[in-house]
Amino acid sequence: MDSEVYVIGRDAVPQFLRLDAGEARSMTLVVPPGTSARLGLEIDLCGPGASLDLAGVYLCNDAERVDLRVLVRHSSGGCTSRQLFKGIVGGTARAAFDGLIYVAQDAQKTQAYQENHTLLLSGTAFAESRPQLEIYADDVQCSHGATVGQLDEEALYYLRTRGIGEAAANRLLMFAFANEIVQNVTIEALRDRLSNMVQHRLHGELNVCAQCMLNNNIVFPITLEE
């Protein structure tokens, strides 16, 4: 199953997806550097055995604002959903993640997981995370979790003792943090483009791929032809 990659532009219109019986989707959402973005996304697993793998990464700095609202609805039994969102927030940027897993009464044998983790790079950056579960079935496996914090001081110290400068050590840890989302992309050419964009952002740069996205107000896929 190949992962689809979608770029989130400013004031993107709400998105609704329906997964029918046995359908499987793997999606990666990207808020590129230099973009303030807001997105409402609702995905309904309405057929038995449907499966969703949803990942996302947001990279914001300066005075950017990112607001992601994700609802994954389990309407039918035997469905699986996995969500992992990560953010790197610096400057005076603000990021908010609001995620809800809804499990209907008839959606027995549901497996649903949601995580959101954010790194703050400055004392003026702000992030909040509101993962929620609303469960009406009794035979389910569901969990959610969220963290907001700084880079690991012990890991930084270890890298510094190996002769790596402070700035380079910071970039290594930030890339390792974001790379879990990058690796969710199964198509090599798309994965390389996303990895390149993340690395340029961590060096304080915008590459051509990211720069061309900044004036878009929509959600659109990255394709190999772009």
Region roles according to the model:
Residues 1-157, 161-164, 178, 184-211, ...:
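Conserved beta-strand/loop scaffold segments within soluble protein domains that form the structured core
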